[in-house]
Amino acid sequence: MSDSEKEYGTLHIERRDNIATIHMYNLTDGIVAGRKLDFHWEIAMALGELRDDQDIRVVVMTGAKDGEFMVSPRTPHYEDPGALAGHNEPKGSWKIFNGIIRAHTTLTEMEKPVIARVNGDAAGFGQSLMFGCDMIIAREDARIADIHMGMGDVAPYGPPFALVPGDGGASLIPLYMSPALAKEYLMLAKEYTAREMADMHIINYAVPMDELDAKVDGIVAKLLEKPPLTLAWTKRSVNRYIADQHNRTLDAAAAYEMVNFLQWERAGYKQDMDFE
């Protein structure tokens, strides 16, 4: 590891040739729990590190374990004494939401392609990160949902109260769907499979799990054949549209969600919900 490379507790970075792969850990794994670590902050720092690494030309984001790209914890982690941001704890909440804003800003501005290798379910911040990537290649049976309004009922992830989708979903989803479909997806926490999203032309590819690596590797190889400066300028040109969208909506949505976290009772908190 060079002096410029950092160690993270919620993810690890694998470097091979000119490719960096970010492996994201399950948020409820023991390697994360109780250590006052936060994935939202660390993924922002990791993306910034890779943006500055001139040896890296393509970044791939994936889950550390097959079956899960990145999902919100099912258990009430925000009530755990080891949580970074508990109820009525604005300092920890601000670090989380600042990380969210930095992560999306870096994904948008990074002068190199970022590929989502969706090797399992993507829910909550995981699906927002997925939509923030430049191309999305998923196993066809992966479940994808924005669980903020799910209240624990729609998908088996997320908190037992309603939240504004302030982690990037409210900004990015309207770029992928019509306003009517985007509001149905967000307001009802509607779940799709990757196959359904590919058929709707929302993501690039949905393939069987045993074909995922070949598809990702093929796309990465083609990108590496292109001149890096031309790739960078093409991405920056297209992403002015995405940057404008974030500038209009991301800070406000993040602020609304942070307010939700500070007043659960007003957000329909189901205190008797069984998390087992």
Describe these PLM feature segments.
Residues I137-A142, M151, I203-L250:
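C-terminal long alpha-helix characteristic of the crotonase
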Residues D29, R35, D55, G63-R102, ...:
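Glycine- (often His-adjacent) and acidic-residue-rich active-site loop
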Residues G124, A189-E196:
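Acidic, divalent-metal-coordinating active-site segment for phosphoryl/phosphodiester hydrolysis
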Residues M1-T62:
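Conserved CoA-thioester-binding segment of acyl-CoA-metabolizing enzymes
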Residues A103, L107, R117, A123-Y185, ...:
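CoA-thioester-processing core
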Residues A46, G99-E111:
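Catalytic-core regions built around general acid/base machinery
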Residues D3-S4, Y8, Y25, L37, ...:
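Intrinsically disordered, low-complexity segments enriched in small/flexible residues
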Residues I22, I43, M61, P113, ...:
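Terminal peptide-recognition signature
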